[in-house]
Amino acid sequence: LGIHERNPTQGQPPRVMMRAMPSLVSTGRSPINVSASASFDAVAPVAAAAPPLSLASPPDPGGADAGVAVVAGAGASMPPDGCGGVVDAAASSAQLEALDAPARLDWAYRTFGAGLALTTSFGIQSAVLLHMVREFAQRSGVRVPVIWVDTGYLPPETYRYAEQLQELLGFDLRAVQATMSAARMEALHGRLWESGTLEDLELYNRLRKVEPLDRAFRDLGVRCWASGVRGSQTDHRRAMPPLQAVRGLWSLRPLLNWSRKDVFYYIEQHGLPQHPLFEQGYSTVGDWHTSAPDDGTTSGRDTRFGGLKQECGIHLPGLMGEGI
């Protein structure tokens, strides 16, 4: 890869060698349970010795964690931290700026306890956060749920990659789908991605991505979710803070200040598998009909959605958000 960047994980606990772990979610032949109803089991921490940061203990309702920036009496529409206090987004973001990615996950669990979840698309860089959440579980004894929105239109390579990472890392995967089947959506609305209009793309993203994800958040009681958004992906993302209010929840971005080389350095350092489409020239992968390899004139998220837009509908504060 020709990578001569700094090590983005400097200061992490010593590397834990990976081993294959049994699937944590299974039904029938597949280790992944894809559910349209999103009826999830409660997430319970597993027993482990308390590390120095006391990660295995959720926030004490008797008093705010000294490392958590909260304010009282404001922002009542946003979910509180685990102590009932209101999170001060500006102060917390300033605090998070000084932390590396694993420490940001530690902070989020100390702040939100069982209200923390992670989202994944099983895309080009997804192995990084999935490996971090596995290592978080190993050092803290806490299994953070990983939510995957299966649109029904992902490339075959993505489905196989999801199986590979799940079997390798053994994270607590919660796969969710839209309540409307792909066939019914196409019968009622047509093949929305073929019309060439932003309105149809936004309807598609709302039906296949945003609504299933928000339903999963409600069913799991999520107050904060971590995602793999990086500032270098788009101009808009470059202006994002590490912590932001998004559709009534807190959005945490552990990898916000990582470069593309940082991502591939981490994958190489930890011996993680690459998405199969990476070798075919893809720098980002979503649904099969809105993803394309870099062609020398466009790259990154400029290759998505036929060039009409860069984002799918997840990470912005409004109804429609910015991509997974």
Residues covered by each model-derived region:
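Low-complexity, intrinsically disordered Ser/Thr/Pro- and acidic-rich segments
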Residues: 1-3, 74
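Intrinsic low-complexity, disordered N-terminal segments enriched in polar/charged/small residues
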Residues: 5-7, 15-16, 30
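Nucleotide-activated chemistry modules centered on ATP-dependent adenylation/adenylyltransferase
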Residues: 22-25, 29, 34-61, 65-324
